[in-house]
């Protein structure tokens, strides 16, 4: 995508969400968003991966949520929610949908609870996989890079 077009797209999306965007080099994730006329506070760890997720989900709309014309989507499942940015963007795009958010990393629970406070998103602090059982989380740097490892005595439940 042309740099000017990408800048204008990001600028427009930021304005619609209630914050300013003047360029990626000086950009900081905002602590508040305007969602359907409601101001919500954002809570997140200061990590490069979280920054990249915010830009790709909210500014670049990598999931094309703004382009889906039907509002008849009734259920959305966010598996591996991290701090919940996709679920928040889905709430913006589909205000009446039932949203289920799954995240196995207990270190992110506080961020998720804060971010979902007034958004009617159902949070489950467990993993989702092919088979139900127990797992262990393997942290690989930033929180969005964590991986699950099957472990019958692991501390985290995985549902299928």
PLM region spans:
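Phosphate/nucleotide-binding beta-alpha loop and adjacent structural elements of enzyme active sites
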Residues: 1-160
């Amino acid at each position: 995508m042309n740099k000017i077009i990408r800048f204008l797209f990001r600028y427009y999306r930021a304005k619609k969400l209630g914050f300013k965007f003047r360029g990626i080099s000086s950009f900081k994730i905002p602590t508040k968003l305007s969602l359907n006329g409601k101001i919500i506070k954002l809570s997140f760890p200061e990590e490069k991966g979280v920054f990249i997720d915010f830009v790709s989900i909210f500014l670049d709309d990598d999931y094309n949520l703004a382009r889906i014309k039907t509002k008849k989507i009734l259920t959305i499942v966010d598996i591996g929610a991290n701090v919940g940015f996709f679920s928040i963007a889905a709430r913006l795009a589909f205000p009446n949908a039932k949203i289920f958010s799954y995240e196995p990393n207990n270190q992110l629970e506080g961020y998720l609870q804060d971010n979902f406070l007034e958004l009617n998103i159902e949070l489950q602090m467990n993993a989702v996989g092919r088979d139900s059982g127990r797992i262990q989380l393997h942290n690989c740097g930033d929180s969005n890079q964590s991986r699950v490892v099957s472990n019958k005595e692991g501390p985290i439940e995985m549902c299928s």
